[in-house]
UniProtKB/Swiss-Prot annotation:
Residues 1-21 are annotated as: Disordered. This is Wtf element wtf7. Belongs to the WTF family. The chain crosses the membrane at residues 119-139, 149-169, 189-209. May act in meiotic drive. The keyword Calcium does not apply. It is found in: Spore membrane. GO terms for biological process: meiotic drive. It holds the Pfam family WTF. The lineage of its organism: Eukaryota, Fungi, Dikarya, Ascomycota, Taphrinomycotina.
Length: 215
């Protein structure tokens, strides 16, 4: 009985085994994926296998451009449900640029003159009504200790109305000032309609107070 035996020359030969079709099999990565040949057979693919994870988290950092810093979170892989790959939550942060903060309320910032004018214009629309109201109270030598329960309730409604009106006027300053320049008559009617509940509250509050003081 005769046969040929080729001794192993190098330890690297132990990591590869030649099959009948002369394709190497990597013992660490496993078998190559099978590809269809068209006639019903399969042959090992030449391309390496692709592995899709269940969750892909992509974070694109643009250090030189803080406006383009985007964090993308994809909870599903492309191999899963097709529509689920479109679920992308993007959160843009602008850390080094104070002017581009999304949520901010800065009445007095670097452009404090502009924001100060906006705040002054918003409050100026309510000052005449408050001035008349408190002037009447001080003229009659009114005191907050003389207020009844209904008086305090009406006073709270009046303060809440003034606060909400000032906040809305400040938040939408560009919109209502542009509308006031273009359509001044309509703006006057709308402004009066918005402040009418506060005016009525002021009159009723003052009437109840005068009635409690002088019968």
């Amino acid at each position: 009985m005769s046969g040929s035996y080729a001794p192993i020359e190098d330890s690297a030969d132990e990591l590869s085994v030649h099959s009948g079709n002369d394709n190497e099999i990597d013992l660490e990565k496993g078998l190559l994926p099978k590809c269809n040949t068209g006639n019903g057979g399969t042959t090992p693919c030449s391309e390496p296998p692709h592995y899709d994870s269940d969750a892909v988290v992509e974070m694109d950092m643009y250090e030189n451009n803080i406006y383009m810093r985007t964090f993308k979170l994809r909870p599903f892989a492309k191999s899963g449900v097709t529509n689920s790959s479109n679920v992308v939550f993007q959160m843009k942060t602008y850390e080094n640029n104070r002017h581009m903060q999304t949520f901010r309320l800065r009445p007095f910032a670097k452009n404090g003159v502009t924001n100060g004018v906006k705040l002054a214009q918003s409050l100026f629309l309510l000052l005449p009504f408050n001035f008349i109201f408190f002037a009447c109270l001080f003229f009659r030598k009114a005191s907050f200790t003389d207020f009844s329960l209904m008086g305090w309730i009406l006073f709270g409604i009046w303060c809440l109305t003034c606060f909400l009106s000032s906040f809305i006027l400040y938040a939408y300053h560009e919109s209502w000032t542009k509308f006031a320049r273009e359509r001044s008559q309509e703006f006057s009617l709308i402004l009066f309609g918005l402040l009418f509940p506060g005016i009525v509250t002021m009159v009723v509050f003052y009437a109840l107070y005068m009635r409690s003081m002088y019968g």
